[in-house]
Amino acid sequence: MTRKSFSIIAGALAAVLMPLTSTTAYAQGMLTEQNAKTIKDVELSADIVVAGGGLSGVCAAVSAARHGATVILVQDRPVLGGNASSEVRMGIVGAKGDQNAEAGLLEEMQMRNFRFNPLLRYTLWDDAIYSTVVMEPNIKLLLNTSVEDVVMDGDRIAAVKAWNINAYTRYLIKGTIFADCTGDGILRLSGAKYRHGRELPSEFDETFLDEGGDAKTMGNS
């Protein structure tokens, strides 16, 4: 091997190994002091904190905001809508029967979608949900933000801790009322009672429900 060819090979290996060495150092925590300087800690508060930005969380947040409450809506994805968003594409399929349709806020979002998205593109459907939320002045929306823990005051939730890895931001979000609309029961971290599966139709007098009382669950986004 000539000196020239050795230099070329050594340079190529250095180029490959340098990022690997940096990645290993990061994984081993060698850069934590530097990273800590870039992490922002933000404290927020609202009347109602909604965890989960699927359709249930969106409807809860918008309804509360229109009744005068201040709301913080925390969604761990870059879009709203959950299983009905462009990420999963289940759509709105809750109404049972050929002649039945969704009403209320769901119908409002669908009408906005039909008006501005006649070809029913899922990416524009995301915009219809998003605009419904951001047009409400009482709602603060946190996308790409995951609830990871709760802060208890006795037997009540005083705050939730959340993390946005894209913005390197940690949130402490205080509230009076907390709504778990994640679909995953994340606020069970508080020790609150929760259930897994479907309830019996008779439990809440759900006349349109013809089955239940089992361990079936939906997928999630």
Name what the model sees in each region.
Residues 1-12:
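Bacterial N-terminal signal peptides that target proteins for export
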Residues 10-22:
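Bacterial N-terminal signal peptides
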Residues 27, 37, 45, 63, ...:
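Conserved N-terminal/central alpha/beta ligand/cofactor-binding core
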Residues 40-54:
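Beta1/beta-strand and adjacent pyrophosphate-binding region of the FAD-binding site
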Residues 51, 173-183:
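Short hydrophobic core segments
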Residues 57:
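N-terminal Rossmann-fold NAD(P) dinucleotide-binding loop
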Residues 180-221:
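Glycine-rich loop(s) and the adjacent beta-strand/alpha-helix scaffold that form part
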